[in-house]
Regions:
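PLD/PLD-like phosphodiesterase catalytic module centered on the HKD motif
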Residues: 1-18, 22-145
């Protein structure tokens, strides 16, 4: 479903994508098809936001995505909430027209659809996390001395 969502985002030109998960361990972010979809999607005026407890698994498991993230840093906002309970952080792919929410990430069970009520409610929850329960994270480059 995540693969199809990113392909749809590219095809339909979604203005914004927001993804949230404790660590994105089981998301297909590093797959060639996903990164190609994101590459096709990324244009001026687009926004991509990520929220996680930790980005360690993203860096370790999704090298193609990490490379894409570095290229498109100017459209990305990455936030982290390291003290959050991993089961408390929503596991979501949100766009202005469609949302996928994993209600049970362990069993990968959830809901998806374009219903306005669901999209608004999920976005409000995500906004709360982004505004008051997280801080900047997952820099596009790591500068060392």
């Amino acid at each position: 479903m995540v693969r199809d969502a990113f392909a749809t985002a590219a095809r339909e030109g979604w203005a914004e994508i927001l993804i949230s998960d404790d660590n994105f361990h089981d998301w297909p972010l590093g797959e060639r098809a996903v990164v190609e979809s994101l590459q096709a999607w990324a244009k001026g005026g687009r926004r991509f936001t990520m929220l996680a407890v930790s980005y360690d698994d993203v860096i370790r498991r999704h090298a193609r995505f990490v490379g894409w993230r570095g290229t498109w840093d100017h459209i990305m906002t990455c936030r982290k909430s390291p003290s959050a309970d991993p089961l408390e952080l929503p596991s979501v792919l949100w766009s202005p027209g469609w949302v996928m929410q994993r209600l049970d990430p362990v069993r990968c069970a959830g809901v998806a659809g374009g219903e306005a009520d669901r999209r608004v409610l999920v976005r409000e929850v995500l906004n709360e996390w982004l505004r008051s329960k997280s801080s900047p994270g997952f820099p596009s480059t790591t500068l060392g001395l």
